[in-house]
Swiss-Prot record:
This is Large ribosomal subunit protein bL28m. It comes from Drosophila melanogaster. GO terms for molecular function: structural constituent of ribosome. Its main location: mitochondrion. It is found in: Mitochondrion. PANTHER family: 39S RIBOSOMAL PROTEIN L28, MITOCHONDRIAL (PTHR13528), LARGE RIBOSOMAL SUBUNIT PROTEIN BL28M (PTHR13528:SF2). GO terms for cellular component: mitochondrial large ribosomal subunit. Component of the mitochondrial ribosome large subunit (39S) which comprises a 16S rRNA and about 50 distinct proteins.
Length: 302
């Protein structure tokens, strides 16, 4: 079969479409970020907008026919506003609604009920005013605190970029020993004892890359690459080479000749004579032919 295809063995299992991690800067992203991305985008979240059925078969109420159960999640729309709040896994649903029996169905958007509330983080030691839903408040109460809610739930269940950013900050604070409570050692130890167990599934690199969007991860990678490969301007490079050649020839730099007025008056003549002699020796050497062209004291070739 492989000889029948022009590409050989490569197309036996079909053509794989390149993804965001297969080309460009996305291919250079570390495995720590890819693990977070799989948890955020490729993991099936908990059912929020429908009740999943546990049985494999069910009987139709009208036709009484037996049919298999298909727990297909609803397609959700993550709006920019959803990433600026904490919606508890909820999102906007687009569908159709038949409002009257004798009229056609019309498009409709179902939006969760939003409200602004204040949440408190023990690890960060701060209060935050965020837009939440009733489900978010219920889950915070079930988890016995906002920090537990962030650390217990996976990225696919938190869903919003704000919640993931706060979770990364909480993990980094726990990793650094809760610096926000440095003035209260007893309370600091209590918080560390209560939340330290959430650090076990993560490595320091995974915590550093956790909660970033794809664009933020690319910008962070570009910043690391620029810092690792700093380009030295040619001006500084050539200046360093010139100073090194002058130093080998015995000529001191102009900045180092600056002395007090009393000493400068005595040694000015000596420095001029020594510099002229050194430049003359430097001109005679074959490696300094280019320097003789810019030396105003050098002899002109006839």
């Amino acid at each position: 079969m492989a000889h029948a295809t022009p590409q050989g063995v490569k197309l036996l299992n079909g053509w794989k479409r390149p993804g965001r991690f297969d080309k460009g800067l996305g291919a250079q992203l570390p495995e720590a970020y890819r693990k977070f991305w799989r948890e955020w985008k490729l993991t099936t979240p908990a059912a929020v907008h429908y009740i999943p059925k546990e049985q494999q078969w069910e009987r139709d109420e009208v036709t009484h026919a037996i049919k298999p159960v298909q727990n297909i999640p609803l397609p959700l729309i993550d709006t920019p506003e959803s990433h600026r709040g904490i919606w508890g896994g909820e999102a906007v649903i687009k569908g159709f609604q038949k409002r009257e029996q004798t009229k056609r169905r019309v498009p409709h958007f179902w939006v969760p009920n939003l409200r602004r509330s204040v949440v408190h983080s023990h690890v960060l030691d701060c209060y935050m005013s965020v837009v939440v839903t009733e489900r978010t408040l219920e889950q915070i109460h079930e988890c016995h605190g906002f920090d537990h809610y962030l650390l217990k739930n996976r990225a696919c269940d938190l869903r919003s970029a704000l919640a993931l950013k706060l979770k990364r900050e909480v993990l980094q604070a726990l990793q650094n020993g809760v610096p926000a409570l440095a003035d209260e050692p007893e309370r600091q130890q209590e918080v560390l004892k209560e939340y330290r167990r959430y650090l076990e599934p993560y490595t320091p690199e995974e915590i550093d890359w956790y909660g970033h969007t794809y664009l933020e991860a690319i910008r962070k990678l570009q910043k690391q690459l620029r810092e690792a490969e700093k380009v030295v301007p040619h001006k500084l490079e050539f200046r360093g080479k010139l100073i090194e050649q002058l130093r080998q020839a015995g000529i001191s730099e102009a900045g180092k000749l600056e002395k007090p007025d009393a000493l400068a008056a005595e040694s000015s003549v000596e420095h001029k004579d020594s510099d002229i002699e050194a430049l003359t020796k430097l001109e005679s050497s074959p490696s300094s032919s280019w320097l003789s062209k810019i030396n105003p004291f050098g002899k002109k070739e006839t």
